[in-house]
Amino acid sequence: MIQTRPLIAVLDDEPQMCKALGRLLKTYGFEVVTFALGAELLAACASRLPNCLLLDLHMPDINGFEVLERLGAQNLRVSVVVITGHDQPGNAERVRALGALDYLLKPLNETQLLAAIGKIIQTAA
């Protein structure tokens, strides 16, 4: 039986954030793909769904809320952890209503991030 590493997709328009998350997650054995645009992520999900999506809310093309809505409309079941540096009242509740499993604030706490991803990976196993 071939073991595959869990695939984590990162959607963030900040290149430094994508690079830092990619480096961190790879050290923990995850396969990582990064996207700077929501449209790119949605196109990629049509061919391969990630085990977990780290989703920034504020994006230049399609915001995180719209990404969640489109994933749901396309019946693409992806476990999502929202990451944002722009917390607003009601955001956490809104993203959870759209299907996100967790909501984390930037700057990210490595322990909290890994716990959120670990919970998703364990549940899927």
Feature locations, PLM:
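Two-component/phosphorelay signaling modules centered on CheY-like receiver
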Residues: 15-33, 98, 120
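Short, glycine/charged-rich "phosphate-handling" switch motifs in NTP-dependent
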Residues: 101
